[in-house]
Structures are given as structure tokens and as C-alpha cells.
A protein has these predicted regions:
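Cytosolic-side membrane-entry/anchor segment at the start of a transmembrane helix
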Residues: 1-21
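A structural signal for well-ordered alpha-helical scaffolds and beta->alpha junctions
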Residues: 6, 57-61, 147
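A residue-identity detector for tryptophan
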Residues: 8, 35, 74, 120, ...
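Juxtamembrane helix-loop-helix connectors linking adjacent transmembrane helices
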Residues: 17-101, 185, 189
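Transmembrane helix-loop-helix hairpins at the membrane interface
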Residues: 80-217
Length: 217
């Protein structure tokens, strides 16, 4: 946890430096840069919209993750690898990592870097920092870049960083809990050794080539 505090602290400092030198806020875009500013001039209204978009993005991403892990082999393998890499985490540590990563990474990537590099390049860089030791982790990198693109578009649309931060926290919190609690290997093993259901009382069984009622026990 100590290393994470240092890394996130450095990211926050870098974000504040980048935005401070340009006289900008790391939490919102200038009105003329937000795509919806013409239709929704009030920042409070755009912030509320940003929050709604963030909650929706977070919920959809969490649901998609669970569906992919339970229905595709590549996602299941990735889940197993990430689970081994992360190890056991308490609820408090999950909450800590979800909040600190969600706030810090969004302030740095969307709040500070995106106005300089643009939505697409920032999303690619966001994906590039989510890499693993082997090719199994490639979908994780691509997924992170895709989510970064959605977060970036949300920020550019509303001009408020609240939605991307909330979405990031929701995704990390829910998916870390899922990562720790769900073990596909154990589930698959239990399914293979589950005995067949016993013959129902009154069902017919074949004996000596003819069907006879099963004897109740």
C-alpha cells in the first residue's frame, strides 16, 4: 500500500503542476471546451449529467466484465491471472485502491493530460499503463484503453470530471471484489465432480430389458 501512496501522490502532484502552469482546473474544462456547454450552459447541470453518465458507464462495465469472465475463455484466463497477481485483499484495501486510483488517475489522465494530448492519445496512454507480464493481459490493456476513451468522451462532453471519477471508482471497487471472491478454477472443478441427481421416486428404470417402476427407499 505504501508504494501505491507514493505513485498516486506523484501522479497528483504532476497533474496539479501541469494544470497550474496553464492556469487551468484539473476538475473541469473551460466552458468553451465542453461540447455540451452551448446546450447546457450551467456547470452544475452538466456536472449532474456527468454523474449520471459515470454511474451508467460504471454499471455497464461491471456487468460486461462478469458476463465475459463467465462466458469467454480469454476473459476467464485473464481473470485467473489478475487474481493471482493481486492476491487476497480486504474490503478496506479494495476501497482504498478503488478510490485512490479512481480519483488520481482521472485527475492526471483526463484532467491534466487530455487537454494537452487529446482524447485518443490520452486513452492510448491510459491503456499502455495497464500492462501485464504476458500476452494473456493484452485484453486488459485494450479494455483499459476503451474505458479510457469512454471516460475521456464523457469529460469532453460535459466538462466535468465527476462522472469519469465515479465510473472509475465503481469499476475498480466492484471488479476488485469480484476478482477476489470469484475463482473460475474452483467453480469449474466443483461442476466436474458434482454427482448426478438421484433417481426420483416413482421414476421408471430399465431392468432386464423392460421398464419397471423404481422402488421407493
Amino acid at each position: 500500500m505504501g508504494a501505491a501512496v507514493v505513485v498516486y501522490g506523484l501522479l497528483t502532484a504532476a497533474a496539479l503542476l501541469l494544470t497550474g502552469l496553464r492556469g487551468r482546473s484539473p476538475l473541469s474544462l473551460p466552458t468553451d471546451e465542453a461540447w455540451l456547454a452551448g446546450a447546457i450552459p450551467a456547470l452544475t447541470m452538466r456536472t449532474a449529467l456527468s454523474l449520471a453518465i459515470g454511474l451508467g458507464l460504471g454499471a455497464c462495465a461491471v456487468r460486461a466484465t462478469k458476463l465475459l469472465v463467465t462466458r469467454t475463455r480469454w476473459a476467464m484466463r485473464l481473470h485467473v491471472e489478475l487474481r493471482a497477481m493481486v492476491g487476497p485483499l480486504s474490503g478496506a484495501r479494495i476501497a482504498f485502491f478503488a478510490v485512490t486510483s479512481g480519483v488520481t488517475e482521472e485527475i492526471f489522465f483526463r484532467g491534466a493530460l487530455q487537454p494537452l494530448a487529446g482524447v485518443w492519445l490520452t486513452s492510448a496512454l491510459f491503456g499502455a499503463v495497464h500492462v501485464g507480464p504476458n500476452r494473456t493481459f493484452l485484453p486488459w490493456t485494450l479494455w483499459a484503453a476503451f474505458m479510457g476513451l469512454l471516460f475521456g468522451l464523457s469529460y469532453q462532453l460535459t466538462g466535468s470530471l465527476l462522472g469519469p471519477v465515479v465510473a472509475h471508482i465503481v469499476v475498480n471497487y466492484a471488479n476488485l471484489h469480484y476478482l477476489v471472491s470469484y475463482d473460475p478454477v474452483t467453480v469449474a472443478r466443483e461442476r466436474r465432480i458434482t454427482p448426478e441427481a438421484p433417481t426420483l421416486v416413482g421414476a421408471r428404470v430399465r431392468t432386464s430389458g423392460r421398464s419397471t417402476p423404481a422402488e421407493p427407499r
